[in-house]
From Swiss-Prot:
Keywords recorded for this protein, A-Z: Ribonucleoprotein, Ribosomal protein, RNA-binding, rRNA-binding, tRNA-binding
Subunit structure: Part of the 30S ribosomal subunit. Contacts proteins S9 and S11.
PROSITE patterns: RIBOSOMAL_S7
Keyword Zinc attached: no
GO cellular component: small ribosomal subunit
Natural source organism: Sinorhizobium medicae (strain WSM419) (Ensifer medicae)
Similarity remark: Belongs to the universal ribosomal protein uS7 family.
Residue ranges of coiled coil: none
Cross-referenced Pfam families: Ribosomal_S7
Protein name: Small ribosomal subunit protein uS7
Molecular function terms, GO-annotated: rRNA binding; structural constituent of ribosome; tRNA binding
Listed InterPro entries: Ribosomal_uS7, Ribosomal_uS7_bac/org-type, Ribosomal_uS7_CS, Ribosomal_uS7_dom, Ribosomal_uS7_dom_sf
């Protein structure tokens, strides 16, 4: 890791349809091989499907899903005197959001619906209702942190 310069954070523009920065970050995470228009159509298609099924505003469903997925604590490895301990640490807000987005996309890609729009729609609705594999990932992370609470005094 270079000690000379820290890469500065880039400004991102809010998405054109909802004017939300988090939706733009989500689109950028969905995007593969620089194909932004494909990512846009996937996200907006999933949002339209959520709106038609739940009769709710899709952005509020999206934000509640992210809140249900985002972890509060995680474990980090810390080496102390030849032993490696899994130390529970609090998660910074930016990392919480990034992990929630990453886990939501990974869970959607693992689902077995035919199109990515359907997978994403299903995972968003499941996560908003505290179900689904993305929420399970968060629960597992919290369980790991809870099981290793004895090592929390090694926190740095």
């Amino acid at each position: 890791m270079s000690r000379r310069h820290r890469a500065e954070k880039r400004e991102i523009n809010p998405d054109p349809k909802f004017g939300d920065l988090v939706v733009t970050k989500f689109m950028n995470a969905i995007m593969l091989h620089g194909k932004k228009s494909v990512a846009e159509s996937i996200v907006y298609g999933a949002f339209d499907a959520v709106q038609s099924k739940l009769k709710q505003e899709p952005v509020t469903v999206f934000h509640s899903a992210l809140d249900n997925i985002a972890p509060h604590v995680e474990v980090r490895s810390r080496r102390v005197g030849g032993a490696t301990y899994q130390v529970p640490v609090d998660v910074r807000p930016e990392r919480r959001q990034a992990l929630a987005i990453r886990w939501l996309i990974a869970a959607a890609r693992k689902r077995n619906e035919t199109t990515m729009v359907d997978r994403l729609c299903g995972e968003l609705m499941d996560a908003a209702n505290n179900r689904g594999s993305a929420v399970k990932k968060r629960e597992d992370t919290h369980k790991m942190a809870d099981a290793n609470r004895a090592f929390s005094h090694y926190r740095w």
